[in-house]
Amino acid sequence: MDTSPVTPHRLDPSGGCPHADNARLLARAALAPVVLPGDVEGMAVLGHDALREFLAHPEVAKNARHFTALREGRVTAGWPLLTFATVHGMTTADGEDHRRLRSLVSRAFTARRVEELRPRVEELTASLLEDLERAAEADGGVADLRRHFALPLPMGVICELLGVDPEYRERLRRLSSQVVATDIAPQDAVAANRDLVAVLAGIAAARAERPGEDLTSALIAARDEAGDRLSQEELIGTLVLMIIAGHETTLNLITNAVRALCGHRDQLDLVLGAGASWADVVEETLRWDAPVSYFPFRYPVRDLTLAGTVIPRGTPVLAGYSAAGRDPAAHGPDADRFDVTRPAREGAVRHLSLGHGVHYCLGAPLARMEAGVALERLFTRFPRLDLAVPEGELVRESSFVGNSVRTLPVCLGD
């Protein structure tokens, strides 16, 4: 391991190529000092074992009152990562507040409830495959799979769960993508956050007047029945989190899985020949090309030593999911290889790409189910589907939080 003085890694706001950076940083240590936008100093946990320990550590908090630079006024209002730190919801809450907020939505994402959603997901998938084929026919045989398939499926599902009418969905998609962008101008970041909150507040007001069998109506009822269960800020913050997390993760998961299978035809043939399952594809994609690269934020409540590195109290720390997924110390010397048989191997290490501990991704069962259905139906119908441009020409998503590409042009095959 390289023991020369460590220069903080300046994260590329435009996304860059995380796997190359991760490999270089992991060769040095399991943790890396980083420079966030606005020259805010932070830390990233990259190694699998270190990340697993950190995510479950009792002296690590999510509430931004522990964020030293923010508390001291060194973070501006237009900071592109501010929503991740300050949104009022379960991802920025600790202890009893976290349990209270999580309990209000957890019943919508149980394994039983997710299975009840499967027929609707299959119905939406079938309809979107028709749209994808029409889009390809209208454009010389090429269609953007991300736009016509990978995006509208999870966005449609989460909006139906929340009771969001179709006319709002495109605006919510656009605002969500701006909120998670890390290369956005300060004034645009402020405007995107303001507009997203305003749109969701309007949706909540409409559901308050006309309640339905949806999660937003249930949250409003919880707010109105007992004011101490959910504040108005927490209601809107929860909707912000549900909209963003409810589609961005699955969007990137489906996109990255299609890229992986097109780039590894032997693995696709293995799955189509029943040598591995679509669930295996989902798990290997989550490990090999995690939909979230660096997730903000956690803060040590005291100086914390992790894997031999001291993280000062109040440091904003990123969870390096994409790095941990390819950590050879956990996943072996072939960690960089996409292998759909890996998840079923005896002794295979489970990835951390959907989190660990009390903040484990609430929507994980839904994301897995949506991706599994989408991939199976897509490649069953279009087994010769392939990228329309070389992988190296795909433009990266403009974020070091999300990990994917902006568009995914594909040919559907004969």
Range-by-range predicted roles:
Residues 1-414:
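Cytochrome P450
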